[in-house]
Amino acid sequence: MHKCLLLLLITLGSYALHSQEPTIQRDSSAIENDTISKIDYLKYLGNGYFPTKFLNVDLRYLVKFNQYEGFRTGLGGITNDEFSEKYRINSYVVYGFKDHRFKYRIGGGFRINEATDTWINLSYTDDLQETGSSSFLTDKRFFQFFEPRLLNIDLFHKHITKAINIEHKLTNHLVTETEFAISKIEPTYSYNFVIGNESFRSFDISTAKISAQWSPFSHFETIKDKVTQTKEGFPKFTLQLTQSFKNVLKGDFNYFKVDFRTRYKITHNDKVFSEIVLSSGLATGNTPLTHLYHAYPNNITKETVLQRFSVAGINSFETMYFNEFFSDRFATLQIKHFVKPFRITERYRPQLVLISRFALGNMQDIERHQNITFGTLNKGYSEAGFEINKLLFGFGLSFAYRYGGYHLPEFADNLAAKFTFNVSL
């Protein structure tokens, strides 16, 4: 298996290198027609891709770090329209230097309807996933040069997942995605899920998901025979339903999940705006901890503020400690207000961001989850703070304070001081 993965890694790398056009003398019109414009190139980089002729190399897989794998490095990519407008290949392979394991995904898809942008995708994945994390199928790709939370995560579960996925655009404003998947789950930490007289250390899950994103206020135009979003409108709404089936393709549990999120952006004037994100989730039935919810904590368990000094996340709770809370029902509200940048010089313009976050949650049958200790959010969790971004080379500072129902006795334990990193391409 390792030889096969190394071969896949070498093949992807060689393909990316050889798919780039050789540098030759051409007239200006040929260069303009045959090369990616600077704007398009920066858009690719901003989305985490290095474009070549037939393959867009995925920068997410080059180098990462977390507490379980240590350094995680590899290569991945997706074929582009120059390769084919009807078929695509989307794969990666990575290696963790601390756990000494290869992880990989082999996937591809084919388009069955151009007008509705309907694709059928197939994939086989052998990788890790953070316990308690959740995402929407319809979410657009999100890329950061480095992911702040990832540095300190240690609670992962292994999964081998086979999936078939259908993307379909009902209208320009309403896109859907449906997925059928079977997964073998094995937590990397000490955990048993107890139901009656049965105790599960590892388990199989068979799920069906349907996700829909509605953007009623966005504007779209047809440009070069392709529908393009010309204005991003708010609010946006995302809904996802998940059903797990027992005794279907060896599934061990019946459970149902519903997840909802809305995003709203209020633009006051030039470069002054507010962002509001409301998220919620509910899991019923026999749901293991791996598929429940945390509130995206981003604080490590160390003695002093300086020892906890790290990188602030985008939408994470900076004063909430990792693995401190889990819920089978939760809601979070996050509000950010971006003040007009301070014009110190023409190019040096730091920006103040005021932040307030709130989380509420609970859990039934908490005794089912054995060999792990955590709390719930039934008292309501609150934090407030601010960021000063782009102080130097894209770096800034972040401060947050924990108050309310989960305020801690020691002042310093409620305080989080971190740096931020923002770069615009």
What are these regions (language model features)?
Residues G13-S14, S183:
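Single-residue recognition of alpha-helix boundary sites
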Residues E21-Y95, D99-L425:
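Exposed, low-structure sequence patches enriched in small/polar residues
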Residues C4-G13:
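Sec-dependent N-terminal signal peptides
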Residues A16-S19:
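Boundary at the C-terminal end of the N-terminal hydrophobic targeting segment
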